[in-house]
Amino acid sequence: MEKQAETWIAPGAVVVGDVTLGCNSSIWYNAVVRGDSAPIEIGENTNIQDGCVLHVDAGFPLKIGRGVTVGHAAILHGCTVGDNTLIGMGAIVLNGAQIGKDSLVAAGALVPQGRSY
């Protein structure tokens, strides 16, 4: 794991593997960030809220841009999320999906594998 200045990881959060955390990013309580099969990059000023799961498969890295909020209990799996985007609570974004900058993924939404928005 590589951390930049002012990064915060809550007690009870788990961050393992090939994970890069940008400046002023935060990982909140009970979130799991597992870069065990491919890298995970979390941009600066991004927050991963309580209970989120961020994971990867071989060939499907996870890249989260700057200024992103990933809402409580969301699951991001091997996808790309653009800058200044909100991933709503309980949303699921699957391998190879691409969410553009300045976007909103609704709470509880499912973004299927390989889709781009």
Write out the residue ranges for each language-model feature.
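Phosphate/pyrophosphate-binding betaalpha-module
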Residues: 39
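Left-handed beta-helix
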Residues: 5, 10-11, 16-17, 22-23, ...
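Short, charge-rich, low-complexity interaction segments located
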Residues: 115-117
